[in-house]
Amino acid sequence: KRAARTLAPFLFWSLLYWVRPFVLKQATAPMSAKGLFLAIFNNEANYVFWFFYCIFAVYMCLPLFSLAADKKNIKTIEYVCVLGFVFNSVLPLVNRFVIPVYGGLTPVIVTGYVVFVFMGWLIKNKDYTKKARILIYMSGIFGAALMFFGTYIVSKKGGETDTLFMDYTSIACLPMSAAVFTAAKYIKWERLFRIIPEKFIRA
């Protein structure tokens, strides 16, 4: 059901953007089945749709991941999250500033955006003390500062925009995501709804 809700808008917008140049007579190639295939399967309808493909890749893994989705496996999920942080967030810094490490060493289970699935599940199902939550929030603030100032420093040094700290699984962005997930879990929504109408928040 989750995949279907995502697939429908993806197909709609992909087809719309694929047909658009032909309707406006701006197409640089004739309409063809190959063109339609490339638009849908090679992200040639509109480059901003890249995130759909990442979501679909994660969705295809969920039936397997669901086998581990049990609170008795929290320690295992914590281990996977640590692996994800080390290989997705720390290793790129080691490669850049210390010494190259072969990328094939990265465990397949934490490649791409899959780490967000494990991290989200862990935060949802584990209870964190106030001290632990403060540490998570502080790491998120640190990540935001690192993304801004770190990107400025490495970009200035390289003479062009450097995305080392801007990648979604970078050492800057992953802690920010954890902080947002944690805040969403522990925020007192009922108090917020008293101040701001619920319909505006959900919108």
Predicted features along the sequence, with ranges:
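Hydrophobic alpha-helical segments with transmembrane-like composition
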Residues: Y17, P21-K25, P30-Y128
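Hydrophobic alpha-helical elements at and bordering transmembrane segments
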Residues: A3, F41, F200-A203
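Alpha-helical transmembrane segments and terminal signal-anchor/GPI-anchor hydrophobic tails
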Residues: K130-R202
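Membrane helical hairpin/interfacial module
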Residues: K1-A27
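Aromatic-anchored segments of alpha-helical transmembrane domains
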Residues: S14-L15, V19, C81-N95, S139-V154, ...
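Divalent metal-coordination and catalytic microenvironments
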Residues: A3, I55, V180
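Membrane-interfacial loop-to-transmembrane alpha-helix junctions, especially the N-terminal start
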Residues: K1-R2, T6, N73-C81, K131-G140, ...
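Juxtamembrane loop-transmembrane helix junctions in multi-pass integral membrane proteins
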Residues: R2, K72, G103-T106, T163, ...
